Amino acid sequence: MGGVIILTSILIPVLLVGKLHSVYTLLMIATTLVLGILGFADDYIKTFKHNKDGLKPKVKLGGQVLLGLIVGLTLRFSPAVQINETVEVKIENNKEIVVKSPDVKSTRTTIPFVKNHNLNYADLFRWAGPKWMYNLAWVFLVLLTVFIVAAVSNGSNLNDGMDGMASGNSAIIGLTLLLLAYISSNAVTASHLDLMYIPGSEELVVFLAAFVGALIGFLWFNSFPAQIFMGDTGSLTIGGIIAVSAIIMHKELLLPLLCGVFLFEIFANFDVGHFVKHGKKHRIWKKAPLHDHFRTSYSDFKKAWPNSTVTFKGRGDGFNNVHHEVKITIRFWIVTILLAAFTLLTFKIR
């Protein structure tokens, strides 16, 4: 239940420094509390009730869906949630003058590899006509929010299986989102990078700074050999914070790239789960989540599943060599750093 320490380390500075009337601050606090309570209940059942299954999956998913609906509907109906779609910086008398368009409630989002970095979800529903296209876009966006919150929080939860794994990866992702939040909150910087300016998103900078600081402090004691563990209290909440902050900044479509490690953890878990449930003879990974694949020898896999085959057997004499968890963790960090760097580079690739 070390995740309680992470949550406390986030909430105290936010409550002291943040603007509590900001809708963005309130959404992030709600995310922390809802998923924190959900994760704590799961840890409590596992630890004190001695039930290794913990909270029922339907209850856990229900909590994630509820949070996703709260976030999505708040973004839809709160008058305080608006963006500035176009910001121009003009030079007059050797001075920069910022020219902004009116703040609007928008269904636009940031998408990499395209000329203006923008995708309007309403464009996907032009077939419905001008009367319905924006309403359908918001319905889609709310459902997408629910999916992203559930997917990223579960991905973070699956990633928490080795000392320092989830805390290190999440700190890197959080630092990237912190930089994006700063850019989104600054009209001049947003204009230079051709990104949306989001008034009030400076409160996300405060929250994400506390988030990254809490994770780095936790990593000090969670690195191998770990003295403390975050449990579901920490891992579920961390994923939710990453998801909701990206959605608020209209950067949710960057998450498959930025959180690629979480994505592959989910894929590996689905692959192995499908294999076990349906009695398949072949699977891609030896074990799930993905990080466990790298510390499972091929001989151990064959002992457990003698009549089964696997795509990625591993390397070494007889495919029996496995990596130490420290090496696996550091390599996962390196992959996350590369994904974070590439995520930022996408703004210059058109």
For the regions a protein language model found, what residue spans apply to each?
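Alpha-helical transmembrane segments
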Residues: I6-I37, Q64-E92, I97-T109, F140-R350
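Alpha-helical transmembrane segments within multi-pass membrane transporters and channels
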Residues: L35-K46
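Membrane interface segments of multi-pass transport proteins and intramembrane proteases
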Residues: K46-K56
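Individual transmembrane alpha-helices with interfacial aromatic-anchor signatures
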Residues: P57-L61
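Extracytosolic (periplasmic/ER-lumenal) interhelical loops and adjacent juxtamembrane/interface segments
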Residues: E92-M133
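Glycine-rich adenosyl-nucleotide cofactor-binding module
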Residues: F125-I148
